[in-house]
Amino acid sequence: NLGANVSETSLPLTDHALAVYYIIAPSEASANLSRYDGVKYGLGSLNASTSAQATESTRGAGFGDEVKRRILLGTYALSAGYYDAFYKKAQQVRTLIRREFTDSFLKFDALVTPTSPNVAFKIGDKINDPFQMYMNDVCTIPVNIAGLPSISVPGGVSDGLPVGLQFIGPQFGDTTVIRAAAAYQRATNWHNNHPLI
């Protein structure tokens, strides 16, 4: 109806994207946030009498549990003896995932996937298991690590909760992604439906 030819494809390497992301992103965060020592960057401690006390009292100040968890994970991945096994290998797999997407865009102008494997959380709900929370990113992470443009639009409702639909384009294909998503929204009414709160 919208002038698109639709067919299925498979990107098997994207199965590794979540692991790749949760090695690369925490490693980069760890490297960037290591400067927050409370002296030049970060929250300083006015009550410390030594630099060691200042560092100890301010090192984690201002960071939530999830940020601290990711900094520790990244520091581990970048540490001696683990850099090649984790960070370097993750970067290599990232390159393969990017290439797989690039190859798919030789055949397709855009890809369409769910935004998340689950419906939206109910207000106030959350998952206390960090791994399960990370799994909610399984559809969007591959696109991010490949450096591609994407947009999520309302794609329907399941059990009264909204479901997202993700449009993905080739590198620098932002206009294609926006046009495809806009055409979908003009043809559907999901973006005008609001769940009862």
PLM regions and their residue ranges:
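Gly/Ser-rich, acidic/histidine-flanked active-site/gating loops
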Residues: 1-30, 35, 107
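Short, surface-exposed loop/helix-turn segments at secondary-structure junctions
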Residues: 46-50, 85, 89, 93, ...
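Structural helix-boundary/capping segments
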Residues: 1, 5, 35, 40, ...
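Short alpha-helical scaffolding segments that buttress acidic/His motifs in well-ordered protein cores
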Residues: 20-21, 67-75
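Glycine-rich phosphate/pyrophosphate-binding loop
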Residues: 42-69
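Short, hinge-like loop/turn segments at secondary-structure boundaries
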Residues: 23-28, 129-131, 169-170
